Regions:
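A broad, low-specificity signal for short, low-complexity segments enriched in glycine/proline
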Residues: 2-4, 22-25
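Histidine-anchored nucleotide/phosphate-binding helix
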Residues: 27-31
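Ligand/cofactor pocket segment of small-molecule handling proteins
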Residues: 14-24
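STAS-like cytosolic regulatory interaction modules
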Residues: 1-15, 32-137
Length: 137
């Protein structure tokens, strides 16, 4: 979307049954990319459980999360991120970056994800996967 010149990204979570930390870290990444271009990410209509998860990890402190209708003039495009769409190196880099994003927004997330990130780093080193290469998405 951002590559197409759109400065607004609206994500409706009303049909989302659950969130994992990688997804929430991806939201932080999308937010940062849009903010860098004076754009905006809106996340709307999360379930009570999803809202609690977003709040617990600090995502609601930086991402606009609320209940509201789709803004007029917006067109929806269904998107999905699936591990099968990535080679193993790209997927591991994506997961790592997502969790680093969560750590960057709330110091409590370092404790939550430190061991996971260390294990991920070890796995990447064992598989000789470059940690800083940009993933192709």
């Amino acid at each position: 979307m951002l590559e197409n010149g759109s400065l607004f990204f609206y994500m409706d979570l009303s049909k989302c049954r659950g969130l994992d930390s990688t997804f929430m870290g991806m939201l932080v990444d999308i937010h940062k990319k849009y903010r860098a271009r004076n754009g905006c990410l809106w996340v709307s209509n999360p379930t009570a459980n999803a809202r609690k998860q977003l709040t617990t990890l600090g995502v609601t402190e930086i991402v606009d999360v609320r209940d509201y209708e789709k803004p007029e003039g917006f067109e929806f495009e269904e998107i999905s991120v699936n591990a099968a769409d990535f080679d193993s190196g790209s997927w591991l880099r994506f997961v790592k970056k997502s969790h680093e994003n969560l750590v960057s927004i709330d110091h409590k997330n370092r404790k939550r994800f430190n061991m996971f990130l260390q294990n991920l780093q070890t796995e990447m080193q064992e598989r000789n996967i470059q940690c800083n290469r940009e993933e192709k998405q």
